[in-house]
Amino acid sequence: MAVSLTEGVVMKMLNGEVTSETDMMPVLQVTELKLIQSKLHQNQESSNRYKFLLSDGTDLAAGMLNTSLNSLVNQGTIQLGSVIRLTHYICNLIQTRRIVVIMQLEVIVEKCNIIGNPKEPGHSSINPQRGGVNTQSNGGSEQQQARRSDVNGGRYGVSANSPQPQVVHNSSDAGRYCVSANSPQPQVVHSSSDAGRYGVSANSPQRQVVHNSPDAGRYGQPQVSQRYGTGSGYPETSPSTRPYVSSNAGYGGSRQDQPRAPTATTAYSRPVQSAYQPQQPPMYVNRGPVARNEAPPRINPIAALNPYQGRWTIKVRVTSKADLRRFNNPRGEGKLFSFDLLDADGGEIRVTCFNDAVDQFFDKIVVGNVYLISRGNLKPAQKNFNHLPNDYEIHLDSASTIQPCEDDGTIPRYHFHFRNIGDIENMENNSTTDVIGIVSSISPTVAIMRKNLTEVQKRSLQLKDMSGRSVEVTMWGNFCNAEGQKLQNLCDSGVFPVLALKAGRIGEFNGKQVSTIGASQFFIEPDFPEARELRQWYEREGRNAHFTSISREFSGVGRQEVRKVIAQIKDEKLGTSEKPDWITVCATISFMKVENFCYTACPIMNGDRPCSKKVTNNGDGTWRCEKCDKCVDECDYRYILQIQLQDHTDLTWATAFQEAGEEIMGMSAKDLYYVKYENQDEEKFEDIIRSVAFTKYIFKLKIKEETYSDEQRVKATVVKAEKLNYSSNTRFMLEAIDKLKIGDANSLPIKAESSNYRSDAFNSGVGTSGTRDTASVDARREFGLPAANQVGQYGNQYSSDARSLGGFTSCNVCRSNSHVSANCPTLMSEPQGQYMGGTNAGGGMPRQHVGSY
């Protein structure tokens, strides 16, 4: 469609003739569009503004879009070539430049070819009243009405009181305002508060300055088309005879119209030669957009970067890249990732990207590649998360640039700051370091439970070096699988590899030890001088050398499982301390409540995990989450099973949530919900419940005392549930029995058959039990066995027995390894009586029943 722009309106805006919609509602075209983002609030959408150039077909004006209209650009309604009508705007004067700020507009055409050949107008003087140029001519004489105070008048050494140079401008645009290029030029004097700034004396004579530049006037130099006052208040006369008047006289002195000198002369009374030659027009005049500067950028070293630099470019190699992470804070949800950089000088710095920058750069960054990076914001480094030796880190935004380039051999692939293991002993806790050594041993992977009821893998190894010291290195998470398994295979084959760890964190949990963090990197059998030197030392003498560990003990597989029986939850008052107790029990599900086995949950992702808070039905098919303050069309279903656990000692109630519930039921809560309520298949639902009931599991429980309605209750939560593997459980029992051989028959788990039954291994029908063995009682509680006395009876009843500290004998009567004391032939052949200290004192041996575990 044919579109007509409002001709000449841009020049009227620049001259101050049109300032708002009350003067005119012009139709203009967008010829350039650029996003401007605040450096203080990069993550807030409201800080983004769009800057553009507006064309009337002839001239260009700079404009700024109100933030409330940003959605028009984001949706593509306004783009390059769009034709718009300004319905609410204002022309502001910002540092001698007119900026059109648009509050409301009407889009006429979303996209159109550039109309005409618009150009950016040259420099124009500003009228005090309206900011425009106001040059009047009266009877052949020109009276200069504009008063101009230029604070930079003395920037190039021109003093306010010194004889001023005659300025002659030879420009191809000299006739733009009907002034001949060869006509006599007015002498220009700039009143300046910075006189003599560049070392020129205030009273020194000045040379004549002749400007033969097409850009005269762009940087403060007046063009021939502009008529300025002298700025000193005296009439315009010959340069050689002009009187010196105070620079402030222009604001109070008399101004007289003087005839122009017939011939311009220099300070030496020589006629000024005409220097006019055909010149190229000023920049942006009768031209399109400025061509991109293809000159190679100046490379800055990382060590020289600081927050006060406006522009910089670094050439770097990416040494590591973190995974994409999501977060949620009071300002809303977000995402971020970071990567580390290294330059040719060994400088290192971390780069962090948020939100839109993540989408722009995440797939572009590849570890090991070389890039040119510029236009980032330098922020103070957060040392809690940044281990690099740099006080700053770079934050990228949508205006930043990352340009891949060819590999540069001068930039190393890695940069280490190795410390001897002996030095680690004196380093501060939670500090980071690089360490290299020989792996002497490694443990299997074990699962550790976190406070948020999630499991994480852990694996430990011993590292030693030429300092004669060794240290425990703990691997967490994914390091246990890839690197950990490779190290395990090498150690099992008899090859003790060289391991370099970059960015390990020093801890003091078990003496001094080194642990991996998210930014850690493993290098197995690396090929650099430190590794080769270490390998040669180990083959020469290190293999048989003695080492002192700076860790108190090698934890190996980590903390063993605390095996308990259900009765011990009450007997030992578990969960009543400040921290919860974590135990493992072997129990059977004897009952399950099926009325409310699940709840409706919020599926909205909160970082890497769903919200999972309870949602309510709005009645219109949508569900509302109070925490997220949002409505969703479909909810999720999560388990909240109430189950009764029972073993040979007691029973207790426990709650199993989503993950543990799926392990118990073998299906998702949503599927089970549909079976019962959607399909209403009660028979199938009951079959599923019956298949779970009376099944033995190994339960990991979290025991914690909580308050309900001002009442203290001990609550058990199922963290993990595994169906009982009889083979592995038998091995566990045999190991427990072997470790209990130091005790007597009381070391076996006993089950009371009646309330009158005394579960001591030796008691008479009428007497009391013999002296108890402290070691056996402690061993029972360590491995989850009931105490030798009645179940639940415990206290400070420790009386040592020399027999408990003896050798690994099974019978404390005859010291034989072939049987236990209860089946000792010596006792069988003697008269029945009470056994005490190896003698029979009457009574008889009671029947015993060894309960299942």
UniProtKB/Swiss-Prot annotation:
Keywords: DNA damage, DNA recombination, DNA repair, DNA replication, DNA-binding, Metal-binding, Nucleus, Zinc, Zinc-finger
Annotated Polar residues bias: 124-144, 159-173, 180-194, 201-211, 222-249, 263-278
Family the UniProt entry places it in: Belongs to the replication factor A protein 1 family.
Record GO biological process: DNA recombination; DNA repair; DNA replication
GO cellular component: nucleus
Keyword Repressor annotated: no
Native source species: Arabidopsis thaliana
Sample GO molecular function, one term: zinc ion binding
Positions of the DNA-binding region: 312-399
Gene3D superfamilies: Nucleic acid-binding proteins (2.40.50.140)
Protein name: Replication protein A 70 kDa DNA-binding subunit C
Family annotation (InterPro entries): Euk_RPA1_DBD_C, NA-bd_OB-fold, NA-bd_OB_tRNA, Rep_factor-A_C, Rep_factor-A_N, REPA_OB_2, Rfa1
Zinc finger (C4-type): 602-628
Start and end residues of each stretch annotated as Disordered: 118-282
Subcellular localization: Nucleus
Function according to Swiss-Prot or TrEMBL: Component of the replication protein A complex (RPA) required for DNA recombination, repair and replication. The activity of RPA is mediated by single-stranded DNA binding and protein interactions. Probably involved in repair of double-strand DNA breaks (DSBs) induced by genotoxic stresses.
Subunit structure: Heterotrimer of RPA1, RPA2 and RPA3 (canonical replication protein A complex).
Coiled-coil parts of chain: none
